[in-house]
C-alpha cells in the first residue's frame, strides 16, 4: 500500500515544485503518515456534533426538577419582594375588620422603587417570560386589594344604616326612659326607712309593704351611693319594734345576693318614705286611667279648640297634625282619628241643625211601608184602605202626607243639638271601631233604599197580579 500510494504524490509534488528527488521521497512518506490521522480526526469531530443536535430523545428531563428550577427563578426575581408584600396586605384585609387601603400600597411601591435605585438593582431579569408573569401577578393582587376595600366600605355603610334605622324605629330613648324611676335608673327614689317611725306613724302602709312578695331589687352601685334596696319577703317585726327582713341585691356582675339586715340597720327619714310612696301611687293611678281608646281631657280640649277655630275648613294639614300631636302627647293616628270622628259627631249635627232637610226623613219613613208595595199593587192597597176607612194622616196609596212632615223640622234641629252634646261627651274616644260600625250601617241603608227604588219602578204585570179586581 505504501509503495502504490507514494508515486502519485510524488508526481504531483514534482510537477508543482522543482525539488531534488531525495527530499521528495521523504516527503511523500510524511504526507502518507500524516494524512490518515487527519481523516480520523475529522470523523472524531463530526460524531459529537451529531449527538449534540438530538439530546431530547436520548435523556428526558424530570418534571419535579423543572418545577424546582422555576421556583428558584421566581424567588430570585427582583420583583418578588414587592409581590410578597402585596400578598400579605391582601391577607390582612381579609382576616381583620380594618381593611388595608390601596393608598398604603402606592406608598409601598414608591419606597420599593427608591430602594432598588439606591442599591442599583435591576427591576427585571434576563427571562422575559418570567418578568411578564411577575408583573401580571402583581396586577391581579392589586385588583383584589381594591375589591376588598370596596367590600369593607359597603359593610361599614350597611352597619351604619342599620343602626340608624334601629334607633329611629324603636325609639331607644323612650324605651330606656322610665317615668317611675325604675331600679336601674339613675334617679331612683331611695326607700330609706326608719323602722320605729314607720311602725308608729304608718302601720297600714307597712303591713301592705310587708305582704308584698315581689320586693325591690337594686344594683350594688346604688348601695354604694347610700340607697338601700330591700325585698320584703318574709319580713318580721321582732321585739323592740325593730324590723328584720332579708335584702336582695344585684352585684355589678349581675349576680343576685340575698342578705339579712339585722335589727336597727335600716334608719331613714319617714317624710322621704311618704313622698316616695305617694308619688309611686299617683303614677300608678295615672297609668290605670290611661286606658285604651280614651284620650286625655287636656288633649281633647286642645283639638276641640282648634276645630272650632277652623270651622270653615276643619281639615288640619300634616304639619298641623304633628304640632297638635306634640302638644297633646298623642300619635298622628290618634289625632287623625279624632278629627275624623269630630267632623262626623260635632260638625255634622251642627250643619244639620242650621240647614234642616226633611227629604231624607221622608225617604226613610217611606221605606218603612216597603212590605205593602212588595206583596200587592197600589190599587189593592188603596181598596183595602178605603174599606178600613183609611189611616189619619195618610194618602189613599198608603204613603204618609208630606204636610205632616213640616212639624218635624223643629224636632230635627232638637235632635241634632242633642247629638252634638252627646258627641262632646264622647269625643275623647278613639272611635276606630265606631267608624267601622257606622260605615256598615250606612251601607245597609243604601242597599235597602236601592231595593225600594227597584220595587217602585217594577210593573204590576211583572208581579203576576193583573186581575186585581178579582182579589179584592
UniProtKB/Swiss-Prot annotation:
SUPFAM superfamilies: Homeodomain-like. One of its GO terms (biological process) is regulation of DNA-templated transcription. GO terms for cellular component: nucleus. Residues 1-62, 351-371, 386-405, 423-472 are annotated as: Disordered. Residues 46-56 have a biased composition (Low complexity). Residues 26-38, 396-405 have a biased composition (Polar residues). Residues 361-371 have a biased composition (Basic residues). This is Homeobox protein PKNOX2. Belongs to the TALE/MEIS homeobox family. The gene is PKNOX2. Residues 429-454 have a biased composition (Acidic residues).
Amino acid at each position: 500500500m505504501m509503495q502504490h500510494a507514494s508515486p502519485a504524490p510524488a508526481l504531483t509534488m514534482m510537477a508543482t515544485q522543482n525539488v531534488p528527488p531525495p527530499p521528495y521521497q521523504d516527503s511523500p512518506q510524511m504526507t502518507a503518515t500524516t494524512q490518515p490521522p487527519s481523516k480520523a480526526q475529522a470523523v472524531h469531530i463530526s460524531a459529537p456534533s451529531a449527538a449534540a443536535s438530538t439530546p431530547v430523545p436520548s435523556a428526558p428531563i424530570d418534571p419535579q426538577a423543572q418545577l424546582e428550577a422555576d421556583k428558584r427563578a421566581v424567588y430570585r426575581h427582583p420583583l418578588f419582594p414587592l409581590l410578597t408584600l402585596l400578598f400579605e396586605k391582601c391577607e390582612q384585609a381579609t382576616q381583620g375588620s380594618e381593611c388595608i387601603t390601596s393608598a398604603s400600597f402606592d406608598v409601598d411601591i414608591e419606597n420599593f422603587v427608591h430602594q432598588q435605585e439606591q442599591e442599583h438593582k435591576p427591576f427585571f431579569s434576563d427571562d422575559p417570560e418570567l418578568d411578564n408573569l411577575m408583573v401580571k401577578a402583581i396586577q391581579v393582587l392589586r385588583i383584589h386589594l381594591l375589591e376588598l376595600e370596596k367590600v369593607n366600605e359597603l359593610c361599614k355603610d350597611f352597619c351604619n344604616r342599620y343602626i340608624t334605622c334601629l334607633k329611629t324605629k324603636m325609639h331607644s330613648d323612650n324605651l330606656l326612659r322610665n317615668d317611675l324611676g325604675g331600679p336601674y335608673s339613675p334617679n331612683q327614689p331611695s326607700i330609706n326607712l326608719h323602722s320605729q317611725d314607720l311602725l308608729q306613724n304608718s302601720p297600714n302602709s307597712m303591713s301592705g309593704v310587708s305582704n308584698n312578695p315581689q320586693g325591690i331589687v337594686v344594683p350594688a352601685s346604688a348601695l354604694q351611693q347610700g340607697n338601700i334596696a330591700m325585698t320584703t319577703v318574709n319580713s318580721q317585726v321582732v321585739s323592740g319594734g325593730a324590723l328584720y327582713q332579708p335584702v336582695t341585691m344585684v352585684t355589678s356582675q349581675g349576680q343576685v345576693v340575698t342578705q339579712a339586715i339585722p335589727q336597727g340597720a335600716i334608719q331613714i327619714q319617714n317624710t322621704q318614705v311618704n313622698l316616695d310612696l305617694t308619688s309611686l301611687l299617683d303614677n300608678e293611678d295615672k297609668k290605670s286611667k290611661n286606658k285604651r281608646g280614651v284620650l286625655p281631657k287636656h288633649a281633647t280640649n286642645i283639638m276641640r279648640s282648634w276645630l272650632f277655630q277652623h270651622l270653615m275648613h276643619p281639615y288640619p294639614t300634616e304639619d298641623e297634625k304633628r304640632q297638635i300631636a306634640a302638644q297633646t302627647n298623642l300619635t298622628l293616628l290618634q289625632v287623625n282619628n279624632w278629627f275624623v270622628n269630630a267632623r262626623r259627631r260635632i260638625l255634622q249635627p251642627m250643619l244639620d241643625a242650621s240647614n234642616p232637610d226633611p227629604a231624607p226623613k221622608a225617604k226613610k219613613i217611606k221605606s218603612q211601608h216597603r212590605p205593602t208595595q212588595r206583596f200587592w199593587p197600589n190599587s189593592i192597597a188603596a181598596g183595602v184602605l178605603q174599606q178600613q176607612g183609611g189611616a189619619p194622616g195618610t194618602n189613599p196609596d198608603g204613603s204618609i202626607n208630606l204636610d205632616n212632615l213640616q212639624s218635624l223640622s223643629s224636632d230635627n234641629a232638637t235632635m241634632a243639638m242633642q247629638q252634638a252634646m252627646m258627641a262632646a261627651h264622647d269625643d275623647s274616644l278613639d272611635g276606630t271601631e265606631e267608624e267601622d260600625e257606622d260605615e256598615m250601617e250606612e251601607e245597609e241603608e243604601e242597599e235597602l233604599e236601592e231595593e225600594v227604588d227597584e220595587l217602585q219602578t217594577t210593573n204590576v204585570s211583572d208581579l203576576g197580579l193583573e186581575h186585581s179586581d178579582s182579589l179584592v
